[in-house]
Every structure is written in structure tokens, then in C-alpha cells.
Amino acid sequence: MAISAKLVKELRERTGAGMMDCKKALTETDGDIDKAIDYLREKGIAKAAKKADRIAAEGLVHVEVKGNEAAIVEINSETDFVARNEGFQELVKEIANQVLDSKAETVDALLETKLSSGKTVDERMKEAISTIGEKLSIRRFEIRTKSDNDAFGAYLHMGGRIGVLTVVEGSTDEEAAKDVAMHIAAINPKYVSSEQVKEEEINHEREVLKQQALNEGKPENIVEKMVEGRLRKYLQEICAVDQNFVKDPDQTVEAFLKSKGGKLVDFVRYEVGEGMEKREENFADEVKGQMK
């Protein structure tokens, strides 16, 4: 099959491998990008791939905390200009509050709920679209709860480009919980701890690392030990509690929270537009679109 330049570019961005290596990997795997990543890793050409999610859409993430409940919300706009608009920022906060007040479980259910003004969220969104002049949409939200003996950590990076909500058990130190939220914003772990990693993912990683070691020409009798060592390192890279804490790399996140009497039990990290693709237009088409 013909391998498109766009696919090669994506594989290069995700693996850091050279253009010809990427093209060969895609050819060998019939254009399957995930298999091509494994191929490059097994050959020792690429490290573990970056997340596939391409950040393209605009908007804001907001975290709202009320007592023992907290909500994290993402609302999308078409342009970054609108995301910086004060009216849009107020709208995002208003919707986050409504998520907590309504206890809605889905976006569709949330849209039907009534605000204190008597309008539904759907009517409020349409009103904002009319005022701001751009398509706006509530993309997702999640609610977390805690006890009086626990703490929420809320952190917004770049004014809401990234938002993190952490739940720390056994400590009411909100500053420590926020510091861990900041760590998660920066490092972007996938899990709280290795206990959350599915066996399927561990087995897949183990197989890739085994092929990598064999392709390096390592004796089979030491391959297993090497694989387990590399697997531990991989798990450290994706699990928050095992990572070196960004504000104090001499200790892990787990050790930092333990010193405060707490333990990380949950987190939610939203990055605006992750997994979404912006419509691709060249400058000439953009100008034509504005002249219509």
C-alpha cells in the first residue's frame, strides 16, 4: 500500500525516528501506526511513543471545588481568541458550578438542567454562541468526591489549557494535593499506580521489550532479567506515585505525600482538545472563507 507523507510525519512526531525508518516501518506493517511504533521500538530505533492525542481544538478547562465535591470541565471554542474572552471564561465557571449542583451524569443530561436564572444549560450555551459569535460546546466533565479527612488538589496550567484534579486520602493538606496536581500537569502520567495498569498492557510491553533485547543480540539467558528491569522503568514512567516529584526530584510523589500523611488515590487530567483534530486549511482558503 502507498504510505502517505502525513502518516510518516505523524509517526516521526510520535517516535522521533528518522523519515526513512518511519517509512520502512509503515511499509512493513501495512500502514498500521501502532504496529509501526512497536516495529521501531523492537529494532531499537525509537523509544516508547508519545501519546497519540493531537492537541488542536481551542477552549478552556476549569476545576470547581465545593466542600467534598469537585468537578473538572472542558468547554471548546473555535479559536484561542475566544478562549481568552472574559465572557467565555465566566461561562466555563458557571457550567462547572452547574455540574456540581445538578449532579448530571452526561453532557446531554447537563444541557437539560436548569440554571438559577431559569434557563436550561442548552439555552445558556446558545445565548453565549449568539453573543460570542463562535460555535461553543461542552465536551466532557467528571465529578469526584472525598471525605472530610481528605484533600482535593486543583491546578490550571496556562490559564486553563491543562487542568488537573487530584484526590489525596488521609491528609487535608490542599497545598500538597495541588503540588501533585501540578506534577501531573507537567509529567502527564497515565495511572495513579501500577495496580491500575491492565495485564494486557503489561504483557504487550513485556513482549516489545523482549524483542528489543533479542534484536540487540543479548544472550537469551539474560534477556528475561533485562526485560523485567526495563518493564519496571516503563511502569515508573506511566504511574504517578512512582515518579520523581517535579518540585523535589530526590523523592517520589508517593514519598512526598507520605511525608504529609496522605496518599494519592485518584486524578483527572484534561488537556484542551486532546484527541480532537482541528480542520486543516491553508491561509488562502482561510481568507476565502472570511470573504464569503
Curated annotation (Swiss-Prot):
Gene3D superfamilies tied to this protein: 1.10.286.20, DNA helicase RuvA subunit, C-terminal domain, Elongation factor Ts, dimerisation domain
UniProtKB keywords: Cytoplasm, Elongation factor, Protein biosynthesis
GO molecular function annotations of the record: translation elongation factor activity
Residue ranges of the region described as Involved in Mg(2+) ion dislocation from EF-Tu: 79-82
A GO CC term attached to the entry: cytoplasm
Keyword Protein biosynthesis among record annotations: yes
Domain of life of the native organism: Bacteria
UniProt cross-references to Pfam families, sorted A to Z: EF_TS
CDD domains: UBA_EF-Ts
Primary site of residence: cytoplasm
Record's keyword annotation contains tRNA processing: no
InterPro entries: EF-Ts_dimer_sf (IPR036402), Transl_elong_EFTs/EF1B (IPR001816), Transl_elong_EFTs/EF1B_dimer (IPR014039), Transl_elong_Ts_CS (IPR018101), UBA-like_sf (IPR009060)
Cell compartments where the protein resides: Cytoplasm
PROSITE patterns in alphabetical order: EF_TS_1, EF_TS_2
NCBIfam families for the chain: tsf
Family from the record: Belongs to the EF-Ts family.
Protein function: Associates with the EF-Tu.GDP complex and induces the exchange of GDP to GTP. It remains bound to the aminoacyl-tRNA.EF-Tu.GTP complex up to the GTP hydrolysis stage on the ribosome.
PANTHER family assigned to the protein according to its UniProt record, in alphabetical order: ELONGATION FACTOR TS, ELONGATION FACTOR TS, MITOCHONDRIAL
UniProt name for this protein: Elongation factor Ts
Organism: Staphylococcus haemolyticus (strain JCSC1435)
Lineage: Bacteria, Bacillati, Bacillota, Bacilli, Bacillales
Gene of this entry: tsf
